[in-house]
A protein has these predicted regions:
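Flexible "cap/lid" loop of the alpha/beta hydrolase fold
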Residues: 112, 120-150
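Conserved serine/cysteine hydrolase catalytic core
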Residues: 184, 189-234
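Active-site loop/oxyanion-hole signature of alpha/beta-hydrolase fold enzymes
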Residues: 40-44, 53-98, 264
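Conserved HGGG/HGGXW glycine-rich cap/lid loop of the alpha/beta-hydrolase fold
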Residues: 16-65
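Alpha/beta-hydrolase fold catalytic core
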Residues: 1-27, 47-51, 86, 91-92, ...
């Protein structure tokens, strides 16, 4: 599955397919600093029942990124090209979608713009964006400062990034050292550009579109991630055919902190009425 990130760029997005492509497909979209590798342990548990497609988003993993065209259009161009490749793929039936954080924001835009492509979706620790242009401008300015830190001292940035309270439960988890090492595989210049082009400040708000949702969605949030618990509650109130699952004792990275529970909830939801 070859995906280009922009109508003005031929940069391919790297993907990895886990198992037979004739099985029902689940598309997995990772968060900022991650890659498709984040989903491999989960995909391996699902390989007897699903073809798991692990996407490296622009500027992450093996996917390059180029700053061609209007930066305000890049987010939705990424959404559009993902949808185009999915609609052109050999399997005609709708697929399942899972997105975390940055990948969750992209996934939510995909669902609302191209509902015919998807059977069900799980959105993890993500939001429909910022409601006002003033908020988006402020966020772009903040993200620019973060991008410069990435470019100046990548290792120092990674250390400081995971000092944030929303990652406290991950940092105390046995998996943290592995996660930290995987983050450092990424190219810092690409990550900085990805933040500038795919950050929340560049994302068009989809709050007003939630009421038009046509795809069954489960929103996941960690109990300790209070910001996204509240966002999840707000989304469920606006979004038809949706529900919120709160993961006890977990923070922002609940799919890493409690993979067993995540897999259980995913299979329950995707297998229901299959």
């Amino acid at each position: 599955m070859s995906i280009t990130t922009s109508s003005n760029s031929e940069t391919p997005l790297n993907t990895e397919n886990i198992k037979d492509s004739s099985l029902p497909r689940i598309i997995f979209l990772h968060g900022f600093l991650g890659s498709g590798i984040d989903w491999v342990p989960i995909a391996q548990e699902l390989e007897n029942d699903y073809c798991c497609i692990l996407v490296d988003l622009p500027g992450h993993g093996e996917s390059d990124i180029e700053a061609n065209g209007d930066p305000d259009l890049f987010f939705m161009e990424t959404v559009d090209t993902l949808a185009e490749e999915l609609s052109r793929s050999a399997a005609p039936e709708p697929c399942y979608l899972v997105g975390y954080s940055m990948g969750g924001r992209i996934a939510l835009s995909l669902l609302l713009r191209y509902p015919e492509l998807f059977e069900k979706a799980i959105i993890v620790s993500a939001s429909p964006g910022l409601r006002t242009e003033e908020e988006r401008l402020s966020r772009r300015e903040s993200d620019e400062g973060i991008a410069r830190k990435i470019e100046r001292n990548f290792d120092g940035f990674i250390k400081a990034w995971y000092e944030q309270p929303l990652f406290a439960s991950l940092k105390n988890h046995p998996i943290f050292k592995e996660v930290e090492s995987e983050r450092k595989i990424n190219n810092p210049e690409n990550l900085a550009l990805a933040l500038r082009l795919l950050g929340t400040g560049r994302q068009p708000s989809t709050w007003d579109e939630l009421q038009q949702n046509r795809v069954p969605i489960q929103f996941f949030a960690g109990e300790k991630d209070l910001k996204f618990v509240e966002i999840g509650r707000q989304m469920v109130n606006l979004c038809p055919d949706s529900s919120l699952e709160i993961f006890a004792e977990c923070g922002h990275t609940l799919h890493l902190e409690n993979r067993e529970l995540f897999l259980d909830r995913l299979t329950q939801f995707f297998n229901k009425h299959q």
